């Protein structure tokens, strides 16, 4: 497999952002005992804040909808009980031999025992990709419409404690951005905001989605989690699907990383996809931010979360994103913990083999070489013409700063040509409304 030959160790391109001035962090006893403590994320300010009184990250805040569901308990229990070191080569080969794979098979495919068999796994994943998606690669682009945020997520460039330029697009600016994107030929758009109900309320997002429907055939949102009735409203405004990153499924680590704001509430975020499906959304996307914690356990929990949702809501469409941690403004030291390119390939292939019908996106966080090869092997959806700043598609100068650094700056035209060179079929829209 030619693509396998191009998957090498992690890209070590030099960071371009100014590092945070305070890099020496005094670890707590809990952090010292944590084998997956990612020191690159923490700075002195975060360490100081974490010693203050913090709210219970498992307690719902006022106005948050509570579902009568057991999915959270099932997923967290399975994640905590997942001992990937107990799996053997025989377990991995057994998983590869199955036509329909179980959660136990998925666990084996994510284990260290699977790495020596990565080429065989990739070939199997490629066959599943061909079976369900043929040579198709679906294109989309993100549109960041606001970067105000009320959360304190210490690894995120938008977090409320990070000193960046903030902006929110008005109606005229939204139209200008959408027209600029539409002129490239793009027909699917993903609308994103920072997590601030005050500065980017649901009505504002809904109005942006109504505008987007005038220019694009498919509209998705990646915003702060909302209640079922609010997802229903956004669906009425033209939204087809909702993506929410859980970031990490390790509840204790989640509490260390999300120090303030609505995002601190772990269960409310976990149930976002279920509320979206109840609100009438056609599809939902899930992801862990690989490198925040033990990536194998987080990938296992992500896959199991989607699996259980699919059993409960068989009409829904499900998708995975596979992001790795990236540097941000004011901290260029951030890096994914032990998630090199071989490990990333293992995760994406495991997703494909476990839920072969699910869409898999590889974002512009990855370099062009890795993205192209993953499309050839197991992924089927790619972003193009990406700008994570506010107003970056049409303005000569961004109105607001970006969320994180990207590693693939290619235009739609350039990625379209790259896919054709790989004998893949670019697809700009998969749906027709009648």
Question: Where are the regions a protein language model picked out?
Answer:
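Auxiliary Fe-S-binding modules of radical SAM enzymes
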Residues: 1-114, 311-434
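An N-cap/entry alpha-helix motif that binds or orients negatively charged groups
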Residues: 100-137
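Conserved, mostly hydrophobic/aromatic
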Residues: 125, 153, 191, 244, ...
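Canonical Radical SAM [4Fe-4S] cluster-binding loop centered on the CxxxCxxC motif
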Residues: 131-173
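Generic structural signal for well-ordered alpha-helices
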Residues: 141, 178, 205-209, 231, ...
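Core AdoMet radical
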Residues: 160-177, 181-276, 282-286, 292, ...
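Catalytic cores of alpha/beta
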Residues: 228-236, 293-307, 367-377
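Glycine-enriched alpha-helix->loop->beta-strand junction motifs that scaffold or abut catalytic
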Residues: 235-241, 280-282, 356, 376-383
């Amino acid at each position: 497999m030619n693509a396998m030959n191009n998957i090498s160790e992690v890209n070590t391109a030099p960071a371009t952002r100014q590092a945070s001035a305070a890099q020496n962090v005094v670890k707590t006893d809990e952090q010292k005992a944590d084998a997956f403590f990612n020191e690159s994320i923490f700075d002195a300010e975060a360490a100081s804040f974490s010693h203050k009184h913090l709210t219970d990250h498992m307690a719902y805040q006022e106005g948050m909808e509570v579902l009568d569901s057991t999915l959270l308990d099932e997923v967290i229990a399975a994640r905590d009980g997942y001992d990937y070191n107990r799996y053997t080569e025989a377990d991995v080969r057994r998983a590869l031999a199955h036509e329909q794979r179980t959660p136990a098979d998925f666990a084996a495919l994510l284990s260290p025992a699977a790495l020596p068999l990565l080429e065989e796994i990739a070939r199997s994943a490629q066959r599943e990709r061909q079976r369900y998606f043929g040579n198709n690669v679906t294109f989309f682009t993100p549109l960041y419409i606001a970067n105000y945020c009320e959360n304190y997520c210490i690894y995120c460039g938008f977090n409320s404690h990070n000193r960046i330029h903030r902006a929110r697009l008005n109606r005229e600016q939204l139209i200008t951005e959408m027209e600029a994107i539409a002129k490239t030929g793009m027909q699917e758009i993903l609308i994103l905001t920072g997590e601030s109900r005050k500065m980017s309320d649901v009505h504002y997002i809904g109005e942006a989605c109504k505008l987007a429907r005038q220019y694009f055939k498919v509209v998705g949102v990646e915003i702060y989690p909302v209640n079922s009735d609010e997802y229903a409203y956004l669906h009425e405004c033209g939204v087809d699907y909702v993506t929410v990153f859980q970031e990490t499924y390790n509840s204790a680590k989640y509490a260390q990383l999300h120090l303030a704001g609505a995002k601190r509430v772990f269960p409310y975020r976990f149930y976002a996809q279920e509320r979206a499906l109840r609100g009438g959304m056609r599809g939902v996307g899930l992801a862990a931010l690989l490198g925040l914690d033990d990536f194998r356990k987080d990938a296992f929990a992500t896959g199991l979360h989607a699996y259980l949702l699919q059993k409960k809501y068989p009409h829904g469409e499900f998708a995975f994103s596979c992001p790795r941690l990236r540097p941000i403004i004011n901290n260029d030291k951030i890096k994914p913990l032990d998630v090199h390119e071989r490990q990333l390939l293992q995760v994406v292939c495991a997703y494909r083999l476990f839920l072969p019908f699910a869409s898999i996106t590889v974002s512009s966080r990855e370099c062009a070489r890795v993205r192209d090869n993953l499309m050839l092997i197991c992924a089927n959806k790619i972003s193009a013409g990406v700008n994570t700043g506010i107003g970056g598609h049409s303005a000569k100068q961004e109105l607001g700063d970006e969320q994180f650094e990207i590693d693939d700056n290619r235009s739609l035209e350039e990625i379209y040509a790259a896919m054709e060179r790989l004998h893949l079929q670019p697809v700009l829209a998969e749906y027709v409304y009648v």
